[in-house]
Amino acid sequence: MIDYMKEYGKVSNEFALEGKVLEICPYGEGHINLTLLVTTDKKRYILQKMNTRVFPDSDGLMNNICGVTEHLKARGIETLSVVPTKDGKSYIKWEECYRVYDFIENTVTYQTASDINVFRNSGKAFGEFQNYLAEFDASKLTEIIKRFHDTPNRFAAFKEALEKDAFGRAKDCQKEIEFVLSHENTYGIAMEGLKDGSLPLRVTHNDTKLNNILMDDKTGEARAVIDLDTIMPGSMLFDFGDSIRFGASTAAEDEKDLSKVHFDINLFKAYAEGYCGAVKDSITAREAELLPYGSYLMTIECGMRFLTDYLSGDTYFATKYEGHNLVRCRTQIQLASEMEAQFKEMGEIIKEILA
């Protein structure tokens, strides 16, 4: 059994903590970084061993986090608070990289939306996060994962994997391949908009899951958006769309029975009410017009990535059985095609909310 005090006591003492460290123990559900709760005789902190294999640019990542959190704090918004090292750095690099945040007390996280109001509130939380950062110069941010939502680039990678067909799997997924190829003309709208300025460059979170919102344990209201490692420059369409992709589906991402997989327009409406209500003052007309498209784009992009990985021998996404990535791809294609069929209705919902 690991003695966390022995293992991490020394590194925790390199940070400007209040009080004497009494206890260090594992904390939370995160998979990327090792997260520990540090208790002193004065207060509590979160110590993280940063995963430099997933995110090698620790300087860029911490500059992004510090820039965004300082901007939010200057506006009186509750957010993650980076605790500096004793010599004033945002993180420490020994054999591994470590950082510390103040622990935000009296909060809880939810793994799943127990009801439609929780999903609406998550839309409000991520919308407020976007709105508060509308004036932040996103061009100052480091692109932590290069070309993360550059869908045409993802499509090029898909075509390359298809051409190679290194594992002879293309014959098993002709229908899915045909869907991805036939929608090529829909993939470039967001990137073209960012390039020509018709879509503003914004701060994007890029991991808008429900469990990345700290909720007040008494009122249930959102207190702070957390897990800021994937903060990058991008489009509002990316965060909104990805939330809808996984949040407005009636089934799990790897549901084999496609008769259970549907895009739920009522869940879309609930999230949009929360999100659009919060960004009313900063959203542009073009962004509002493209929110339904953003939902489709993030869904088809994700499906395309699953299909690319399947064709390439399952080297990126963790799989539990052969064909797992193909099953995931099929759910995303099903959702994307249902969204496509309901663009008009989705657009009317957005217009009504923003009217």
Q: What are these regions, as identified by a protein language model?
A:
Residues 1-25:
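Juxta-kinase regulatory segment immediately upstream of eukaryotic protein kinase catalytic domains
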Residues 25-29, 52-59, 107-122, 135-205, ...:
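ATP-dependent phospho-/nucleotidyl transfer catalytic cores
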Residues 39-44, 220-221:
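Active-site beta-strand-loop-beta-strand hairpin of nuclease catalytic cores
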Residues 102, 274-295:
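Hydrophobic alpha-helical bundle architecture
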Residues 211-250:
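Catalytic activation segment of kinase domains across protein kinase-like and atypical kinase folds
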Residues 237-280, 297-316:
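Active-site activation/catalytic loop segments of kinase-like enzymes and analogous catalytic loops
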